[in-house]
């Protein structure tokens, strides 16, 4: 506990040393930067060399932090300070990037950068990337949530996918993200926003520059203060058995005669016209087509799914929870009738078959928000005729973008012809985690290998993951070197950073805790550090 007390003391000292810059002190610091930066600008200008000005979310200066805080605005202003100096020297051969492993911050920063550049009549290309995205499924999902959201917005000129894997595995992911837009011009029409909203950015019913979840009224466990829910689609199964639930987070213990929930247990299962003839976990609810719901004998835990027309004409509805499918056509051709019929039991399922799916779902959500609809939203998207790898990226883009806008109270991925329920369920929870809207596992912020890397990143990441992957909600940064590591860990709770050949430095947040640990002992030292701070729990024993 002595080490823990020392860290707290260091944090208090750092806090007490922070101070507000006066305008004159701020300007003096800018002048110092200008003096040191201009020689580089002149050399680049002389030789026709391009420059990338990139802001790192975890490395903002004390001066920027004092005025703007650890925010997307701080990132943007930091880059603009250098950009203005370049323009004063008539140097314009520049690309900009906003680097963060936090997808919310990354997307906000790029959007805000464009607005700020427009205000100063600047127009520079943007390089997109989620820094230190990690490995495997998590790394691909996080990259797609961040990069894909901006590509959907029409933002971005170059792309870098940063994975803790061999470099050759990054290119196919980046290419798949970009290639999705090759034929996007063929999409079905989307109802345009009004001229007033376009001209007046504040006219949007949400703030695209700062994450805030849409305020909705709770219906049972959907919406309100509840975390976004996951709906598993079993409607295409020939017969549903207890074994089918194993893939969506429910394990049945024969010795204990009870269901056990994992941290990635789905919240609803959609049966369509199917039935279940066994006792399901008490925390799991069922959704069935409205016509089949009338014949059910479990009105307390089974809820109907209506089309909008079915709901308007229905004589029998659930007194607890009704799901209503809504399309763009429903909202823009029959909104008054539909919205008049909904009540406090209704959850709205926003659906589309448009190739440009995310934009249409966003447009439906905006229209409902402009009409002051407070019922919870579910976004539903069906996929077919693509590979499982493409599904991972496409779904992460479509759902991730809407989650970063703060819209959905639940997501519903229908991809039965492409992937297993287990993969789809894992994908759904991965998207929620990458968007930081529902945390169900440990998050690893790990860098790709480069010439500065001082240990085997893939091997070390695997070792750390095997020991810590049960620590839900903890963020661990695994960085190959001391050059970029501390900055790019950003908001990691713990850091494991290479500081020399065979040597590791451990961090608690951004504070160094221990230096020059032998690599063979470093993982154990990291575990001990986590334990000292009270964030450690033992892995649960699993009974079958």
Residue ranges and their predicted role:
Residues 2, 156-157, 267, 408-409, ...:
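Receiver (REC) domain switch/active-site residues of two-component response regulators
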Residues 1-81, 220, 232-358:
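Active-site beta->alpha loop and helix N-cap motifs at the rims of alpha/beta catalytic domains
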Residues 45, 369, 490:
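Anion (oxyanion) recognition and catalysis
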Residues 482-488, 492-512:
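Nucleotide-binding motor/catalytic cores of P-loop/tubulin-like NTPases across gene-expression machines
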Residues 20-33, 64-222, 323, 330-471, ...:
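Catalytic alpha/beta core domains of metabolic enzymes, predominantly
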Residues 251, 256-262, 495, 502, ...:
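Radical SAM enzyme core and accessory elements
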Residues 176-239, 265-268, 272, 286, ...:
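Extended, intrinsically disordered, low-complexity segments
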């Amino acid at each position: 506990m002595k080490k823990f007390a020392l860290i707290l003391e260091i944090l208090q000292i750092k806090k007490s040393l922070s101070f507000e810059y006066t305008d004159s002190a701020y300007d003096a610091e800018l002048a110092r930067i200008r003096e040191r930066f201009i020689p580089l600008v002149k050399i680049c200008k002389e030789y026709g060399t391009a420059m990338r000005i990139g802001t790192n979310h975890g490395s903002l200066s004390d001066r920027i932090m004092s005025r703007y805080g650890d925010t997307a605005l701080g990132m943007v202003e930091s880059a603009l300070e250098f950009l203005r100096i370049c323009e004063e020297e008539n140097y314009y051969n520049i690309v900009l990037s906003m680097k963060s492993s936090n997808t919310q911050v990354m997307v906000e920063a790029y959007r805000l950068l464009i607005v700020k550049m427009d205000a100063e009549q600047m127009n520079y290309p943007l390089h997109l990337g989620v820094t230190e995205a990690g490995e495997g499924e998590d790394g691909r999902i996080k990259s797609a949530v961040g990069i894909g959201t901006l590509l959907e917005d029409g933002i971005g000129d170059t792309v870098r996918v940063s994975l803790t894997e061999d470099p050759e595995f990054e290119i196919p992911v980046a290419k798949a993200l970009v290639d999705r837009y090759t034929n996007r011009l063929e999409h079905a029409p989307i109802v345009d926003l009004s001229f007033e909203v376009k001209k007046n950015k504040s006219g949007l019913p949400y703030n695209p520059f700062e994450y805030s979840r849409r305020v909705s009224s709770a219906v049972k466990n959907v919406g309100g203060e509840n975390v976004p829910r996951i709906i598993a689609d079993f409607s295409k199964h020939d017969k549903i058995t207890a074994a089918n639930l194993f893939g969506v987070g429910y394990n049945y213990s024969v010795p204990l005669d009870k269901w056990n929930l994992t941290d990635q247990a789905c919240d609803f299962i959609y049966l369509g016209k199917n039935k279940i003839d066994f006792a399901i976990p008490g925390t799991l609810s069922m959704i069935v087509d409205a016509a089949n719901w009338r014949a059910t004998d479990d009105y307390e835990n089974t809820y109907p799914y209506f089309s909008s027309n079915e709901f308007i004409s229905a004589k029998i509805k659930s007194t607890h929870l009704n799901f209503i499918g809504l399309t763009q056509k429903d909202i823009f051709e029959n909104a008054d009738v539909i919205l008049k019929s909904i009540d406090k039991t209704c959850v709205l399922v926003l659906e589309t078959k448009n190739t440009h799916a995310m934009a249409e779902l966003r447009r439906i959500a905006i229209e409902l928000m402009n009409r002051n609809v407070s019922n919870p939203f579910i976004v539903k998207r069906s996929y077919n005729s693509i590979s499982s790898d493409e599904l991972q990226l496409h779904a992460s883009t479509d759902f991730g973008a809407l989650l970063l806008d703060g819209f959905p109270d639940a997501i519903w991925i229908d991809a039965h012809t492409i992937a297993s329920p287990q993969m789809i369920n894992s994908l759904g929870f991965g998207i929620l985690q990458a968007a930081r809207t529902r945390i169900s596992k440990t998050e690893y912020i790990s860098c790709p290998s480069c010439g500065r890397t001082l240990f085997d990143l893939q091997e070390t990441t695997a070792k750390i993951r095997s020991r810590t992957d049960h620590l839900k909600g903890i963020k661990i940064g695994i960085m190959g070197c001391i050059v970029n590591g501390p900055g790019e860990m950003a908001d990691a709770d713990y850091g494991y950073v290479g500081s020399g050949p065979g040597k590791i430095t451990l961090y608690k947040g951004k504070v160094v805790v221990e230096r020059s640990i032998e690599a063979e002992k470093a993982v154990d030292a990291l575990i001990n550090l986590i334990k000292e701070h009270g964030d450690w729990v033992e892995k649960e024993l699993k009974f079958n």
